[in-house]
C-alpha cells in the first residue's frame, strides 16, 4: 500500500501485533521496494493520546471535514476503536433478533473498515473486516478468489478450511487460500468471550482482485 509505518512499544510490558501486509503480491509482481525511514522517532510520537489527531479530524461517523474533501489513496484514520466496532456488531445482531434482515446471514454480523475519504477499503490492496458469529451459529461454506488471514479476536469455535477442521480460541491465526471453502461455527460462551460470540478479525487481498475484475465468490446456501 506504499505506507510508511514504524514499530515501537511505549508500554511497560511486552505487546504483540499482526502486520497485515501486501508483500506476497508485490513479491510475485516484482514491484517490491524497501526504503529506510527516519533514524529516530520523536518523543511526541511515542506518546499515544486518548484521542489522536486523526481521530479528532476523521473519527466522526457520517461526517467529514470540509477542509479535506479530496480523496486519499489510503485511510487517514489511524485508529478504529474497538468500542465502535463492538457496538456496530452488537446492533446488527440485535436488529436481527427484532426480525430485520440486517446481518450477512443468520447469526453472522460483519463490518468493513473503510477509508473515510472514499468510502472504499482502508488500503488499495488490503481489505479489513470484523466478523461476529453468535454462539451456536455456523456460517455457510463460502469460497472467494483472493486469500484471507483471520485472527480469533475473542471467543472460541471450530473452523473448516477445505477438507480440514479444527478448534480455535482467542489469539489463534489461520489462513484461507484462494477459492477454498471456509466456514466457522461459534462455540463461544460468556466464560471465554466478552460478547458471548466468536469474533474474527480478517484481512484479505480482495481489492486487488476486484480492481482486476477477477473477483468471484460462491456461497453454499442450505436447501429449503
List each model region and its residues.
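Conserved metal-binding segment of the jelly-roll/cupin
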Residues: 1-10, 17-18, 22, 161, ...
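A short beta-strand-loop-beta hairpin characteristic of the jelly-roll/cupin
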Residues: 1-3, 138-170, 185
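Contiguous mid-protein beta-loop-alpha structural module that forms a pocket-lining wall or clamp
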Residues: 2-58
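Conserved hydrophobic/aromatic beta-strand scaffold that supports enzyme active sites
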Residues: 4-6, 112, 128-132, 149, ...
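A short, N-terminal "cap"/entry segment at the start of jelly-roll beta-barrel domains
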Residues: 35-36, 42-125, 129, 216, ...
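Catalytic core of non-heme Fe(II) oxygenases with the double-stranded beta-helix
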Residues: 119-125, 129, 134-151
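Non-heme Fe(II)/2-oxoglutarate
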Residues: 131, 201, 206-210, 216-219
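Intrinsically disordered, low-complexity terminal tails and inter-domain linkers enriched
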Residues: 188-195
Amino acid at each position: 500500500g506504499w505506507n510508511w509505518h514504524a514499530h515501537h512499544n511505549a508500554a511497560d510490558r511486552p505487546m504483540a501485533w499482526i502486520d497485515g501486509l501486501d508483500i506476497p503480491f508485490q513479491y510475485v509482481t516484482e514491484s517490491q521496494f524497501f526504503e529506510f525511514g527516519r533514524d529516530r522517532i520523536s518523543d511526541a510520537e511515542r506518546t499515544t493520546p486518548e484521542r489522536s489527531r486523526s481521530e479528532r479530524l476523521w473519527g466522526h461517523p457520517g461526517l467529514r471535514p470540509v477542509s479535506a474533501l479530496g480523496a486519499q489513496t489510503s485511510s487517514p484514520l489511524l485508529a478504529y476503536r474497538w468500542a465502535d466496532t463492538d457496538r456496530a456488531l452488537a446492533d446488527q445482531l440485535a436488529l436481527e433478533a427484532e426480525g430485520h434482515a440486517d446481518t450477512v446471514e443468520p447469526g453472522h454480523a460483519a463490518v468493513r473498515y473503510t477509508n473515510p475519504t472514499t468510502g472504499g477499503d482502508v488500503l488499495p490492496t488490503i481489505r479489513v473486516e470484523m466478523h461476529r458469529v453468535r454462539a451456536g451459529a455456523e456460517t455457510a461454506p463460502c469460497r472467494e478468489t483472493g486469500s484471507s488471514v483471520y485472527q480469533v479476536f475473542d471467543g472460541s469455535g471450530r473452523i473448516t478450511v477445505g477438507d480440514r477442521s479444527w478448534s480455535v480460541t482467542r489469539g489463534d491465526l489461520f489462513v484461507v487460500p484462494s477459492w477454498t471453502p471456509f466456514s466457522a461455527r461459534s462455540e463461544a460462551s460468556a466464560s471465554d468471550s466478552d460478547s458471548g460470540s466468536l469474533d474474527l478479525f480478517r484481512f484479505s487481498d480482495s481489492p486487488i482482485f476486484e480492481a482486476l475484475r477477477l473477483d468471484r465468490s460462491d456461497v453454499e446456501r442450505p436447501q429449503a
